[in-house]
Regions:
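Membrane-water interface segments at the C-terminal ends of transmembrane alpha-helices
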Residues: 1-106, 132-152, 182-199, 224-253, ...
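Peri-membrane helix termini and adjoining interfacial loops of integral membrane proteins
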Residues: 63-75, 158-164, 205-213, 249, ...
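Glycine-rich helix-loop "coupling/hinge" segments at transmembrane-helix boundaries
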Residues: 76, 149-175, 399-430, 466
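Short helix-to-coil transition segments within interhelical loops
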Residues: 106-133, 160, 356, 362-383, ...
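Solenoid-repeat scaffolds in large eukaryotic assemblies
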Residues: 115-116, 179-180, 364, 431-433
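Juxtamembrane inter-helical linkers in multi-pass membrane proteins
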Residues: 116-124, 206-221, 255-256, 260-261, ...
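Transmembrane alpha-helical segments of polytopic membrane transport and secretion proteins
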Residues: 199-235, 451-466
């Protein structure tokens, strides 16, 4: 290990943060100016971009600019470089400042604009919009810095030496716990700084305000700025979302290798779905039970810790003769994933619980309705969608996860994400596309099953009412 790698990691994270914040804020101007169903579609595109697994994004760019990439002979861009890692991470993380700035800018009111009717164009950006979104930019910048600093998958695949990736390589080859504790405190310090940065600060969520009329906003923003932001949005979505998806779906080798990938990775497919399903379900249930206790807000620390550091801690705790029944089994993977992503379950269930009509809760308590009637007539209509959304986010995070499980995965417990991660270390592999397609289908599986199940339940409830 070298402390010089810490400087390289901080430089990489700083560049990614700077570029992601600039791109995200400029695109948020376009989103504020959109309205109706168009805005919904644009927001879905932003969220979908952030939802892509990191190894899938890396694989797409390797397919274009790798050693044998499609465009390598035309464009002399080296994907295996510091600049390549910076580019990929920016394409992954720009939605964070975009969405947070969008939430802040939606707090713009007509009264604020009427106070200075002469401010337009760049003056509006400088004196109104930037100060209004400054807090969101700071918060999102801290989040992106931590995510970029702790990211191991992208630098490791692109062979860029950074502090967290080198920490993982050295520990996995020596299992030197003394070295792990000597350098691991730095990896734990960064998330602590994040928690301090958010202490006492409010986050402007996009759904908390109706925002300004889009026509008024666009008129004050000016022709040049609104068109530049629209071009930037379109280009960024094409590069960061449509290009990776197109490279996957339009590649003939993806479909030729699809059946073979299913046969070769059937066990990994089962492991991926089972680990993600169990973790999302357990975290959601425990999140409901603990949503009243604010002390669990500290669990956000585990989310922003590097997954390999959490794996090292798990090994040091459970690698005991008396715990052989637990160590090296699937339960160890599920508990590690549950701890890392518990903050999402707790925060999501807490928000859902607080959004329920208090008068209706009092009425159900007064009449002593059963738990099924409470769910059917109170919870499901008001927060059923929110509960499923929280569950689904955790499911996706577990499905994509490689860093948490890479050190603790049991024999025969390899997931699809981990298999892709390992294959990409040897360059762009034709079978990787097929495995990524299977992962995307696994991501869509709960949505399909949920839709079918909702139809069955609605039909059953109608018959029950009759």
């Amino acid at each position: 290990m070298s402390w010089g790698l810490l400087i390289d990691s901080c430089l990489l994270a700083f560049l990614v943060t700077l570029l992601a914040v600039v791109v995200g804020w400029c695109i948020s101007l376009f989103l504020v100016g959109a309205s109706g169903w168009k805005r919904v579609i644009f927001l879905v595109g932003v969220v979908a971009t952030f939802s892509l697994p990191p190894f899938f994004v890396v694989n797409s760019w390797l397919g274009l600019f790798g050693k044998v990439g499609l465009l390598k002979s035309w464009v002399s861009i080296d994907a295996y470089s510091f600049g390549g890692a910076t580019w990929v991470l920016v394409m992954m993380f720009w939605p964070v400042p975009c969405l947070m700035s969008f939430g802040a800018l939606k707090r713009l009111t007509p009264e604020l604009l009427d106070a200075e009717p002469g401010i337009r164009g760049f003056g509006l950006l400088k004196y109104v919009l930037f100060p209004l979104s400054y807090s969101a930019l700071f918060q999102s910048g801290v989040i992106v810095f931590v995510l970029a600093f702790n990211n191991i998958a992208v630098p490791a695949i692109l062979q860029v030496k950074v502090f967290p990736a080198q920490f993982w390589v050295q520990f996995s080859s020596t299992y030197n716990f003394q070295m792990a504790w000597q350098y691991g405190w730095v990896l734990a310090l960064i998330p602590m700084v994040l928690l301090l940065a958010f202490n006492g600060r409010m986050i402007a969520w996009p759904w908390e305000s109706q925002g300004l009329d889009s026509n008024v906003f666009l008129e004050r923003l000016g022709y040049i700025i609104r068109n530049l932001s629209a071009v930037l949005f379109g280009g960024t979505i094409v590069i960061s979302l449509l290009l990776p998806l197109g490279q996957l779906l339009l590649n003939a080798r993806t479909w030729l290798d699809f059946s073979g990938a299913i046969q070769a990775g059937s066990r990994s497919i089962f492991n991926s779905f089972w680990f993600a399903f169990l973790t999302a379900s357990s975290v959601s249930v425990i999140g409901v039970l603990t949503s009243s206790y604010k002390v669990f807000r500290l669990t956000w620390l585990f989310l922003f810790l590097p997954g390999v550091l959490l794996g090292v801690v798990w090994i040091s705790i459970f690698n005991r003769p008396s715990l052989d029944w637990f160590y090296g089994g699937g339960c160890m993977v599920v508990t590690a994933l549950s701890l890392r992503y518990f903050a999402f379950g707790w925060e999501g269930m807490r928000g859902a619980k607080n959004s329920i009509d208090a008068d209706l809760v009092s009425a159900t308590d007064l009449f002593g309705v059963s738990w099924w009637q409470r769910w059917r007539h109170l919870l499901q209509p008001q927060v059923g969608w929110a509960i499923f959304a929280v569950w689904y986010v955790i499911y996706l995070l577990c499905l994509w996860d490689t860093e948490t499980v890479v050190l603790i995965v049991p024999p025969g417990g390899e997931t699809l994400a981990l298999r892709v991660f390992n294959l990409l270390h040897y360059g762009h592999h034709s079978q990787v596309n097929a495995l990524c397609l299977i992962l995307l289908l696994l991501a869509l599986l709960p949505l399909v099953l949920g839709f079918v199940l909702s139809l069955i339940i609605k039909k059953w409830l109608k018959q029950d009412d009759l």
